[in-house]
Amino acid sequence: ATHTYAYDPEPFGVSSEPGSGSTIMSYAGFVSGENMQRHSDPYFHYHSIQDVESYVDNVSCHSNVNSSNQKPTVGAGEDYYIPKGTAYYLEANGFDSDNDNLTYCWEQLDSGQVDTSNFGPDLLTGSINRSVPPSENKIRFIPNIPEVLNGNLALSKPSLFSSWETVSNVER
């Protein structure tokens, strides 16, 4: 899988984690001035999972194993327009016929260079929201709820331990 950090994009269209990123295929903690946290979180970004699936689908050294486990279904409702400068939340409804516990992980997939110098509400391309570890909570607030409650909707030039989440003041 390719790296998903966006401070110095690779040419594969998967630079979707602002700054040095936070997932396994990021450079979390390794890029002075671009870190949102000191270490990566133990999960893969959507783009990394897609890379692995694509690779496995195109090699012949594996064998298929039948599983009785069914894939879960999930829906996030209809698409809708979010006014500029507005905090929002995303909500999913998942169902698993095997009654397995479900976790949810909301990730922005926009690829583009996003570093501490250009991150902010006026950014036209790239992710303006970080990936956070999967949880059983099916609702994700953007920016995160403590920032919203403190009136911190727009973030520019984030630093280590900043939320790395902002509303957008431009049409995206």
Please give the residue ranges for each predicted region.
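Extracellular (secreted or membrane-anchored) zinc-dependent metallopeptidases
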Residues: 1-170
